[in-house]
Curated annotation (Swiss-Prot):
The gene is infB. Residues 374-378 are annotated as: G2. This is Translation initiation factor IF-2. The lineage of its organism: Bacteria, Pseudomonadati, Pseudomonadota, Gammaproteobacteria, Pasteurellales. The keyword Cytoplasm applies. It is found in: Cytoplasm. Keywords: Cytoplasm, GTP-binding, Initiation factor, Nucleotide-binding, Protein biosynthesis. It comes from Actinobacillus pleuropneumoniae serotype 5b (strain L20). Residues 450-453 are annotated as: G4. Residues 1-24, 52-246 are annotated as: Disordered.
Amino acid sequence: MSDNEIKNEAPKKLSLQRRTKTTVADGKVQVEVRKSRKIDTAAVKKAQEEAALKAKQEAEAKAQAEKTAAEQAKAEAEAAKKAEGAKVEATKKSAPAVPVMPNSKPKAAAPKAEQPKQEKALDPEKEAKKKEEAELRRKQEELARQKAEMEAKRAAENARRLAEIAREEAAENGEEFEDDRFTSSYAREADRDNDRRSEANRGRGKGGVNKAKKGDREDKNERNADRRNQKDVKGKGKNAKKGSALQQAFTKPVQVNKADVVIGETITVAELANKMAVKATEIIKTMMKMGEMVTINQVIDQETAQLVAEEMGHKVILRNENELEDAVMEDRDVDAEKVTRAPVVTIMGHVDHGKTSLLDYIRKAKVAAGEAGGITQHIGAYHVETEDGKMITFLDTPGHAAFTSMRARGAKATDIVVLVVAADDGVMPQTIEAIQHARAAGAPIVVAVNKIDKPEANPDRVEQELLQHEVVSEKFGGDVQFVPVSAKKGLGIDDLLEAILLQSEVLELTAVKEGMASGVVIESYLDKGRGPVATILVQSGTLNKGDIVLCGFEYGRVRAMRDENGKEVDSAGPSIPVEVLGLSGVPAAGDEATVVRDEKKAREVALFRQGKFREVKLARQQKAKLENMFSNMTAGDVAELNVIVKADVQGSVEAICQSLAELSTDEVKVKVVGSGVGGITETDATLAAASNAIMVGFNVRADASARRVIEAENIDLRYYSIIYELLNEIKAAMSGMLQPEFKQEIIGLAEVRDVFRHPKFGAIAGCMVTEGVVKRNNPIRVLRDNVVIFEGELESLRRFKDDVSEVRNGMECGIGVKNYNDVKVGDQIEVFEVVEVKRSI
């Protein structure tokens, strides 16, 4: 085939992606994949030529400078030589003249004879200077030649590096040089024409964009070349690497630095994204994959945030949120010696059993008459002294709400509980409630049997009734003291105080008297004239006027202190209740009050606590509701089901409590944390919030104050009128806590009558359904002589030529077993399904 034929048969339009060409030798089709982007070798050559020209010009300039310096040195040498000659001439002229005699002509020629001798003497000096000049000139020329050679080598090396950079960048961008060895001149010419047309079309369509992109690429190449040249210049010397080992043809990929993430107890999704330097949507996507739906402002707990951060490749640092608080608390002087302190006593009991009368009598009898006169301000706590000089502090907490609130906040302010029971009335529902509160707080009980002056009083009946509630008197071998008293007539009051002191000696109550004080808030309110007022019971140390107090979310300097009688005091020791003025706000009952050194740090801690409380309130887990009990149990949050039972009659309460106790198993236990007769009160709601319990009301309702607490604390409250419904719902909740069971049920059986071979499915068993239904998507077993030889699933299920989803009893079908071809006549195919069996109590 001639060149003209090849040229005529050349394609009119060549694709830029794939080209096929036939070699002349063997006629094989060669597929060549090319890209339209090509390396601009002309630019590389131009850069090489410019570098070489620049180096040559620099060498010539240096040679010219050296030549000028040599000529200047030569001129200076000649000037010195002339000066020396002039000096010799002057010496000759200054010599004395020789007198000439008339007849002495031969002597007149003597100076002419001496002149050649002097010139001969000066010749060695000239020759030495000429030699020095020649040597200096030779050295300068040699140095210039060496410098020119070095510059030329450097220019060649730079050109070679530019070429290498261009080649490596071409390799990085996936660009390939055209291999012209296997391409004819006609194909190359057609390629170039097609490339020119494509470039022209592209330039018309997206000229501005392409120019910008081209400019960006050129700028990038120049920046990379400059950066590498700078590295090469720095690397020259003894330790400089040679060849391409020093070159990097691509920019080293920048690895994203996974910063350490510091996570507190709670954090919002936006804050976590900011710390991880990612978009919040990435965190939301990650949590969606983990099964959690969150918003950008949602607060998540520390454990969840840790899982998300580790999932996204970050190292997590868990921070204790109380570092600042701990630092402030550690800077306290609490190393003083402990001394015995007075007991703190709370009097509890049924409303009508004389609790208030007993408190009033003790106060009137044991407080000095001068202090007791007039109107005294009742602050909820006061202390009295016995005849032998010992002191007792009484807390007057209306009802049991404040007492339960203290327990809910972890503050144990009470040492001893005095349980007041009327001798004529016996044990009442609120009496039982008081016993439950005392046990929850871990405080010992002293029983005061009141109203013994009445004719119908029966103290023995009280002891027997309390025995049923595990309050065993000393008479029956227990450790609970029973003291008969009469608040109206003042009988047995001293015996009661003595019993309290005896119990305190058993407890061995001690506290630090000297040093910075700490205590608990009994109650607080906002006074119009005095501002926030808090009653603080000092538990250790001494509270002085002017101290800086950190009290829950509030702080402040003690501006004034008053005792229970309204008298100004300057200090208060352990077990002394005082009114404190000067706080920034009204603290909550049960908050811990602590004296600190620095008011600024106290303010920081108070503000931190406020923010933390808001976050924890948003992020706290959902309360134990019946609907979510199963999920809570699977997560390991609930170990037992706490219940508070309130009913209309005592019989119903006992029946419900007994039935609930019988429902308990080894896996799930029901714990009745409170029970009683009557409507649901605020006390019950507070106890439920503290114990994380479910409230059950049987034929009773909650009052307004209780409903407010229930709504605020998100407590689960259920009303029932039929006891079976109550027990069934509790059973359902407990059953949800149990681990589910799975059971296999056989739904169909088919007998193999014949076996066929199919090119696609392999062995096809012609079967007759003998029992139940054979379903296409259910797991199966192959039985041979009632022995399971294979367990798997169906590949196909057909009736005649139609694919079906199920075949019923008495019908024929073709069954293909997936991944099993050893089906034989007489085998049985058993179809079953896995059913979850819910466990029940």
